[in-house]
UniProtKB/Swiss-Prot annotation:
Highest rank taxon of the organism: Eukaryota
Keyword annotations of the record: Disulfide bond, Knottin, Neurotoxin, Secreted, Toxin
Family recorded in the similarity comment: Belongs to the neurotoxin 37 family.
SS bonds (residue pairs): C2-C16, C9-C22, C13-C46, C15-C34, C24-C32
One cellular component (GO) term of this entry: extracellular region
Protein name in UniProt: U18-ctenitoxin-Pn1a
Matching Pfam families: Toxin_34 (PF08396)
NAD keyword on record: no
Subcellular localization, as worded in the UniProt entry: Secreted
Purpose: Neurotoxin. Causes spastic paralysis and death in mice by intracerebroventricular injection at dose levels of 3 ug per mouse.
Organism the protein comes from: Phoneutria nigriventer
Protein backbone atom coordinates (compact mmCIF):
# COMPACT_ATOMS: atom_id res chain seq x y z
CA UNK A 1 0.00 0.00 0.00
CA UNK A 2 1.26 3.41 -0.90
CA UNK A 3 1.00 6.76 0.80
CA UNK A 4 0.74 9.87 -1.35
CA UNK A 5 3.37 10.42 -4.02
CA UNK A 6 6.94 10.79 -2.83
CA UNK A 7 6.28 9.26 0.56
CA UNK A 8 7.56 5.90 1.78
CA UNK A 9 5.95 2.61 0.88
CA UNK A 10 4.13 0.73 3.59
CA UNK A 11 5.94 -2.62 3.84
CA UNK A 12 5.26 -3.79 0.31
CA UNK A 13 6.28 -3.11 -3.27
CA UNK A 14 3.06 -1.85 -4.81
CA UNK A 15 4.76 1.47 -5.53
CA UNK A 16 7.99 0.18 -7.06
CA UNK A 17 9.03 2.17 -10.11
CA UNK A 18 9.37 0.82 -13.61
CA UNK A 19 13.09 0.06 -13.34
CA UNK A 20 13.07 -1.41 -9.87
CA UNK A 21 12.28 -4.80 -8.40
CA UNK A 22 10.89 -5.98 -5.11
CA UNK A 23 13.17 -7.20 -2.32
CA UNK A 24 11.75 -8.93 0.75
CA UNK A 25 14.55 -9.90 3.15
CA UNK A 26 13.94 -12.58 5.77
CA UNK A 27 10.82 -13.85 3.99
CA UNK A 28 9.19 -10.42 4.18
CA UNK A 29 9.24 -10.50 7.96
CA UNK A 30 10.12 -6.81 8.07
CA UNK A 31 8.26 -5.89 4.91
CA UNK A 32 9.53 -5.35 1.40
CA UNK A 33 11.40 -2.58 -0.32
CA UNK A 34 12.02 -1.56 -3.90
CA UNK A 35 15.52 -1.94 -5.30
CA UNK A 36 16.60 -0.05 -8.40
CA UNK A 37 18.80 -1.85 -10.94
CA UNK A 38 22.09 -3.31 -9.74
CA UNK A 39 22.97 -0.47 -7.39
CA UNK A 40 21.12 -2.24 -4.56
CA UNK A 41 19.89 1.14 -3.38
CA UNK A 42 16.61 0.58 -1.64
CA UNK A 43 13.95 2.98 -2.83
CA UNK A 44 10.70 3.04 -0.92
CA UNK A 45 8.96 5.99 -2.51
CA UNK A 46 5.61 6.12 -4.26
CA UNK A 47 5.72 6.67 -8.01
Amino acid sequence: SCFEGGKDCKNDCQCCGKWSYCKCPIWGLFGCSCVIGDSMVEVRKCQ
